[in-house]
Swiss-Prot record:
PROSITE patterns: SIS (PS51464). SUPFAM superfamilies: SIS domain (SSF53697). This is UPF0309 protein SCO4393. One of its GO terms (biological process) is D-glycero-D-manno-heptose 7-phosphate biosynthetic process.
């Protein structure tokens, strides 16, 4: 139901975007979930990365009640989250050539693993280089990005390419360039970003698909339960012990 107040307008816009990704990205979501299920079944590890606010959707699938225990956060110091001071340093680091390759070469990632790279614009050096180098190392790469940026902005990577150009599977968040859903005559800039809502939903849709795919194959999905329900800690201890060699957030 439409609402003329900003809060209602934003929620309507977010709901419309969620419907679009549900309908238009269904095949890509299915493919991404299947890729994660294949990786789990074949003994691989799962990783997710996002810079700045894009890291929120990556963090939301790591050590998460109802999520896959095998999903690990790939961290880049000063880039994941906005806890670095000044916060603008994180944005600057995204544009540094060579950083992504150094991170991957120092990480536990190896051929046969799957890496989800989340970048709204997909234009900066870090996500582009990360996808390129990850594939060169033999990883499967899923990109979560807004494809609109590739046609309406220029790449900041030396190759002139975007994240979407170096992924096995691309999930398009449909977010408009600028990431702001609302405008008002009385407000001098667009406002109310929806990228976190949509990107987090895409990530959960992919992990849900992966869990169901594993179950369809007769494999118990390595899921975590909430630690705030009876028996949750015992359940999680069993799963973390069983898959400990593929889980890095406990080390």
């Amino acid at each position: 139901m439409s609402d003329h107040k900003p809060a209602g307008q934003f929620l309507d816009a977010a709901i419309d975007l969620l419907r679009r990704v549900r309908d238009e990205e269904a095949d890509s979501i299915e493919a991404a979930g299947t890729l994660l299920a294949d990786t789990v079944q074949n003994g691989g590890r799962l990783f997710a990365f996002g810079a700045g606010h894009s890291s929120l959707a990556a963090q939301d699938v790591v050590y998460r009640a109802g999520g896959l225990a095998l999903m690990n956060l790939l961290t880049v110091p000063g880039v994941v989250g906005i806890d670095v001071m000044p916060a603008t340093l994180g944005s600057a680091l995204e544009r540094v050539d060579g950083l992504a390759s150094a991170v991957l070469d120092s990480s536990p990632l190896r051929a046969g693993d799957a890496l989800v790279i989340i970048s709204l614009s997909g234009r900066n050096a870090l996500p582009v280089e990360m996808a390129m180098h990850a594939r060169a190392l033999g990883l499967r790469v899923i990109g979560v990005t807004s494809v609109a940026y590739a046609s309406q902005t220029t790449s900041r990577h030396a190759s002139g390419t975007f994240l979407k150009d170096h992924c096995d599977i691309v999930l398009d968040s449909k977010i408009a360039v600028g990431d702001a859903e609302l405008t008002l005559d009385t407000v001098p800039a667009p406002f109310a970003p929806a990228s976190t809502v949509v990107t987090a939903a895409l990530m959960q849709a992919v992990t849900a698909t992966a869990a169901a795919t594993l179950a369809d194959r007769g494999i118990e999905p390595p899921l975590l339960r909430s630690g705030n329900v009876d028996g949750g800690h015992e359940w999680n201890a069993r799963v973390l012990e069983q898959y400990g060699e593929r889980i890095f957030y406990r080390r």
